[in-house]
Every structure is written in C-alpha cells, then in structure tokens.
Amino acid sequence: MKIANLVFIDEIINNPGMATSPDGPNRLLGPDGGLPEALPPWPSRDNLRVRAVRAVVTAPEGLPLVVVRVDTSEPGLYGLGCATFTQRYAAVAAAVDEHVGPLVVGRHPADIEDITRLIHYSSYWRNGPVLNNALSGVDQALWDIAGKRAGLPVYELLGGRSRSAVEVYSHAAGATIPETLDRAEELIAAGYRHIRLQVGGPGTGTYGAPATRGGYPRSPNPDGWDVQYYLAHTPELFAAARERLGAEVSLMHDVHSRLTPKQAIVLARALEPYRLSFLEDVIAPEHYDRLPEVRAASPVPIAVGEQIGSVPDAVRLIRDGGVDLLRLHTSAVGGLTPTRKLAALAELLGVRTAFHSPGDISPVGVAANLAVDVSTPAFGYQESHTYNDATHEVFPGTPVVRDGYLWPSPEPGFGVDLDEKAASRFPPVKFRFDRWAAGVR
C-alpha cells in the first residue's frame, strides 16, 4: 500500500532542509504545507515501520471471522488482530482496507497508544461496532507484533500472570429440559465446572435463535416470543438442573436482552433458590440506564456488556453499579488497549470480567481475551467455544480447553497464526440470522 506524501523522521534527519511546522522540528509538513498522511511524530530508535494493513475474512465454521494482518518493514515480522463483527463483516473489512490501514502505514508499530487514538479520533464520528472492530484488528495486531519483537507472550507485557490458566464456561442447550441436561452432563464429564443452560420455547430455538415454525402449537403465538411462558418455565429448568446435576456445578443463564427491567427482576428473584453464578443480558442495551436498579433488586449477579460498542458505555456500566460481571465483546470496544484499561477500572470498583467469546470470535480474539484474563486480578469467568478441525487448520495455535481451563500460549505474541491458503477455502457467507430475516418477510 503506497501512501502519498509519506515522510519519515529519518528522512528529515538526512535532509535538514525539509520544512517543519511551527509546533517544532518533529511536526513535519508535507510538500504542500499540510501534514503528511502517515507521520511518525517523534524520532524512533530504529527504522521499523508498518508497511501494510489488510483484512482477511474466512468462515471455517460458517460464521464470518474478520482478522487484520499488519506487516512491517522487517521481513517475517507481522501481527494478527481480531476484528470480527459477524453480522456486518464486509463493512468492517472495508473500514480496515479503505480507512484505517492508510492511517497506520508508515508508523512505528510500537506506538500502540498513539496509533489507536489516531484511528479513534480521526473519523470525527466515533465508536460503534464497525469502526471499533476495525480499530481492534489493528490494535491487537500491534500488540502481537510487540510480543514477537520482545520474544514474550502478550500477557507478560501486561504485567505477567495473576493465574496459570483461566476457568471457562460452556453452553448446554436443548429443545427440552432433559435434552439440555443431557448436554450439561456431557460437559461435566469433560471437565467443565461452569455451564450456561438454555432451553427452547416459543420464539426461541435451543439457544435463543428464532424457533422452528410451529414448534409450540398450543402457544397463543406459536412462532413468536412468549414472555409469560419464558418467565414461568425458566425456573423449572434450573430446578431440574439442581436436582439432576447437584449443588456443586456453577450454573448461568442468558436472557438475550428480551426482558423489561421489571420482568428481569421477577426472573432474578424466581431463580434465587438455584444459586446461579450470573444472569446474562437481562435487558436491552437501549435500557442500560435502568441496570443499577435491576442489579440492586436482583439476588443473582448480573453480567452484561457484549452489546456495548464504546468505552464510555462500558465505563458507565462499571462506575454506576449496573453490573457484577463485565461481559465485553472486546473487539467491539476497540481491542486490547481499551480492554486492559476497563479491566483495571473493574478491579478498582469490585467488578469482575466474563468476556464474550462464542464461535463468532476468531481464535486470535480468544488469545487476546486470554492475555487479559490471566493478567488481571479482576478475572471472573471466560466464555469458551470448541472450534472445529477446519478452524484449527486456518488458525494454527488456536487455544484449546483442557479439563475446563484455557491455558495461555508461551509463544511470543498471541501464539496464534493464520494460514491464508486454508482460509481461502472457507469464503464468508451471509449470516444465518440475515437469511432467516429475509425468509420471513
């Protein structure tokens, strides 16, 4: 990628007659008197530069994953970052290739803080899942490069470990309660101690997705959401779970943002006897200003955050008492740099982390989550996903759950690579919810 009017600090040193701005000798002017498009704003101790930034989209499990590759002027030195917004993957890829990349080419890859602030503020209208995912891809890739240059895993750059591995939770879901609990027993046998339970009902499939048409013919609205059915039958799931699975296993539940604040309180109180570790996404993000009152009235810990698309919104959740656990989709807030700051704020205010990490996050994103998980004292839980063989082929070094834990890679950087030849065999397709929505119109 060629950047017009690109001027480096070392060029100025070798050409003292080149113009500088009134702000000082390190604020260079381009030939037309304006600032160059990509400008190292201070002398660097070496000539390493970002030489290319591009998005790679692949779907080895059918879900489009967006990964950003940042190449440097040192042969073989590159970094990878997760920029996955599955539902709008093409918009993120375009933002990376057309807008974000040109801001970064020519910069020294060590200047992560300044580069990410430049990307964030330069668009004028800031935040949102598209631009923040594009930013995240670059941010995480620069951290990956930093680890590789230092010969250290990224978590050692964040202060080192607070734990050797992180406990994860997985999902047990079914069309019926017995089916859900069968799956839960399989997970327990595999070593999981934390399990999120979901069961089908009107308006939902086994996981909260749109239901199979006609699946609940006795419901007044057989193919649509029935909140009364949900409020009545969800406690039955957890009563059966405690009876069958016992008291030791940790249980969670995801509401998928479907309730009003009052309904969320009703559900939380109904679930109190079953000692859930957390209740997730109890209300829609449009109503997050009501979360403090929900949390204050709930006997169950509240976990929210995966639909947050800005750092200020995440700060408000932590600061204002809206959450017990912060469920960030870390790429949607801009990557590792803001995530580590939010984890530090959470630590100071008594909130724990429980980062979003299902199959619509790339293995690179999992490794980035893991770097924060093992280093922050605020860690609570980590969501997990078991990737298929194709994903492991596309992403060598994909983290693997062993006996209910994720273990960080000792390799420099994040320890995850990208086989682009393998990735090309799995082109992206339209997200399944988009296909479903098109089919019901």
PLM ranges: what are they?
Residues P153, E167, S250, P301, ...:
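Proline-centered loop/turn at the N-terminus of a beta-strand
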Residues A165-A297:
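Metal-dependent enolase-superfamily TIM-barrel catalytic cores that perform enediolate-based chemistry
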Residues G76, V100, V138, G151, ...:
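Conserved, mostly hydrophobic/aromatic
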Residues L29, A38, S73, L77-A150:
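Metal- or metallocofactor-binding catalytic centers and their adjacent structured scaffolds
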Residues E98, D114, R269, R275-F278, ...:
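Shared catalytic-loop signature of beta/alpha-barrel
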Residues N47, L80, R149, H171, ...:
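Ligand-binding pocket scaffold of soluble enzyme catalytic domains
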Residues V66-E74, G397-V401:
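Short beta-strand elements
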Residues A4, F8-I9, G24-G30, L35-P36, ...:
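Flexible C-terminal active-site loop/helix
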